[in-house]
């Protein structure tokens, strides 16, 4: 037995398990990762890298550089993180209706196709080509950016088939065959030559013709511009096929269905893309990054201005909510001083900010001295006086403020030319003048001419104390001037 002391070894207890060795980080070329995320074609992205428009981990990216999972990439003011792609490619078939645009965010607030798609976790849908707002039919979307760029690129010559309804040009009952042959040979558009690779007449009516056309390019509004170059008008346009994928007949508008994985693999094989996972890396947007600051909306004089919609400033006419407070409206003259001469005359007025500007720009006009009574203008009085009553129009009984025939001038003949009861009425017999001061006609055929013209307050019913002649009574014959007025005794 040895006398040498033995050293005791203490084993440390730990709850940590032996971690597996870290897998090497995936590495891919930058432009390939950007294309996989659906940010553009590889050639266009290489040019943007060369122009210094892309940053990796805060530094300007260089042409041909590679990125690894976890690297931070900045592009167009947005931040992304490179991450491994864990699922295979997916393709969605969507039957696009009219009124939807093929953009993620529309500055004019119109509905987009992405609002109707199923949600994704860890990836996003990328549109394969675009359809304008009035075009319906097949729209393909995928999570594979490389597949999307290959199907859209003209070098792959992927066919797009459309059904189109066309109205013949002016002077033609239908689209002539010579025009169809010209479109199949090729015509010159603003951005170069274009043609229909296939064109077939499939029907028509007295006013329209139906065609099936095929193109191998995806230029902006190419089908419509080809027909418009020949003076034809496209009234309906629907895409029915894209490559080997056709629009299912049972798929309703606004609905989508996912393509089977076997067909997705067949698409990649046809385009000679790599089998299996499309790429090792993709981009994920950084969570919580701030949007651009909201801009203030200023309404100009004509009511048009830029507006803030969905975090962006639109250059379109987006002042609908503000312009409604500056609409022109018509005010008609009402009763009182508005409808009469010299009063307020209805016209077009404005309200809101436009009215405030008009009041500030209107010069101050000082009121001059009084000009006295104005003479009536010549011509028809009805043109400038709404209360004018023409001759021959009955407006009320005689003696009333609105007197009838004879109250304003020479009276009309009485029935049977008989005198009234109780003898001749004042001013109604012979050529004598009555109490009314008018000129009577013979045979009692009218009342006397009033002392005052029509409308004068003197013609209104009044009491003796209010009338110029104290002997006048509207209830009986005239009282002699020397007879004093006797007050009726009070009733008990």
From Swiss-Prot:
UniProt-listed Enzyme Commission number(s): 5.4.99.22
Kindly identify the residues recorded as the active site: 132
Please give the Gene Ontology molecular function terms for this protein: 23S rRNA pseudouridine(2605) synthase activity; RNA binding
Q: Which domain of life is it from?
A: Bacteria
CDD domains with a match to the protein in the record: S4
Region feature Disordered, mapped onto this chain: 1-24, 294-492
User: Where is this chain compositionally biased, Basic and acidic residues type?
Assistant: 15-24, 317-334
The catalysed reaction is: uridine(2605) in 23S rRNA = pseudouridine(2605) in 23S rRNA
Mind telling me which Gene3D superfamilies this protein's record contains?
A: Alpha-L RNA-binding motif (3.30.70.1560), Pseudouridine synthase I, catalytic domain, N-terminal subdomain (3.30.70.580), RNA-binding S4 domain (3.10.290.10)
Q: Which UniProt keywords apply?
A: Isomerase, RNA-binding, rRNA processing
Q: Where is the composition biased (Gly residues)?
A: 420-447
Its GO biological process terms? enzyme-directed rRNA pseudouridine synthesis
Pfam family membership, one: PseudoU_synth_2
Kind of enzyme, top EC level?
Answer: isomerase
Q: Which residues form the S4 RNA-binding domain?
A: 28-97
Q: Which family does it belong to?
A: Belongs to the pseudouridine synthase RsuA family.
Function, please? Responsible for synthesis of pseudouridine from uracil-2605 in 23S ribosomal RNA.
**Name the record gives this protein:** Ribosomal large subunit pseudouridine synthase B
What is this protein's gene name?
rluB
């Amino acid at each position: 037995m040895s006398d040498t002391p033995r050293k005791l070894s203490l084993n440390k207890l730990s709850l940590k398990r032996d971690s597996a060795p870290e897998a090497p980080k995936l590495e891919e070329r930058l432009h390939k990762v950007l294309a996989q995320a659906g940010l553009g074609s590889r050639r266009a992205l290489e040019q943007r890298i060369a122009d210094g428009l892309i940053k990796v981990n805060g530094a300007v990216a260089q042409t041909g550089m590679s990125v690894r999972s976890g690297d931070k990439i900045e592009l167009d003011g947005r931040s992304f993180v490179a991450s491994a792609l864990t699922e295979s490619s997916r393709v969605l078939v969507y039957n696009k209706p009219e009124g939807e645009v093929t953009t993620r965010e529309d500055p004019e607030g119109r509905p987009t196709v992405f609002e109707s798609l199923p949600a994704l976790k860890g990836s996003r849908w990328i549109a394969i080509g675009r359809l304008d707002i009035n075009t319906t039919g097949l729209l393909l979307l995928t999570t594979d950016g490389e597949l999307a760029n290959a199907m859209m690129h003209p070098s792959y010559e992927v066919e797009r088939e459309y059904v189109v309804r066309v109205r013949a040009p002016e002077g033609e009952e239908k689209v002539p065959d010579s025009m169809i042959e010209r479109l199949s040979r090729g015509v010159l558009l603003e951005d170069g030559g274009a043609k229909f690779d296939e064109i077939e007449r499939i029907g028509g009516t007295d006013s329209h013709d139906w065609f099936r056309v095929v193109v191998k390019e995806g230029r902006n509004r190419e089908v419509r511009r080809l027909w418009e170059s020949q003076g034809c008008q496209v009234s309906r346009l629907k895409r029915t096929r894209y490559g080997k994928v056709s629009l299912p007949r049972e798929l309703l508008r606004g609905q989508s269905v996912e393509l089977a994985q076997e067909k997705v693999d067949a698409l990649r094989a046809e385009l000679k893309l790599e089998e299996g996972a499309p790429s090792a890396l993709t981009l994920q947007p950084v969570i919580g990054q701030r949007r651009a600051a909201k801009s203030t909306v200023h309404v100009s004089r004509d009511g048009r201005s830029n507006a803030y919609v969905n975090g962006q400033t639109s250059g379109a006419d987006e002042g609908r909510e503000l312009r409604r407070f500056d609409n022109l409206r018509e005010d008609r003259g009402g009763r009182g001083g508005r409808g009469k001469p010299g009063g307020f005359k209805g016209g077009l007025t404005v309200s809101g900010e436009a009215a405030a500007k008009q009041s500030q720009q209107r010069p101050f006009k000082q009121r001059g001295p009084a000009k006295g009574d104005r003479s009536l203008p010549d011509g028809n009085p009805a043109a400038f006086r709404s209360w004018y009553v023409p001759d021959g129009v009955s407006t009320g009984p005689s003696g009333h403020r609105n007197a009838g025939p004879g109250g304003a001038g020479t009276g009309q003949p009485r029935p049977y030319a008989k005198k009234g009861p109780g003898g001749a009425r004042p001013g109604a017999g012979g050529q004598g003048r009555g109490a009314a001061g008018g000129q009577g006609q013979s045979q009692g055929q009218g009342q006397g001419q009033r002392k005052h013209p029509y409308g004068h307050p003197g013609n209104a019913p009044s009491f003796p104390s209010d009338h110029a002649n104290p002997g006048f009574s509207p209830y009986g014959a005239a009282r002699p001037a020397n007879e004093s007025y006797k007050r009726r005794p009070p009733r008990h």
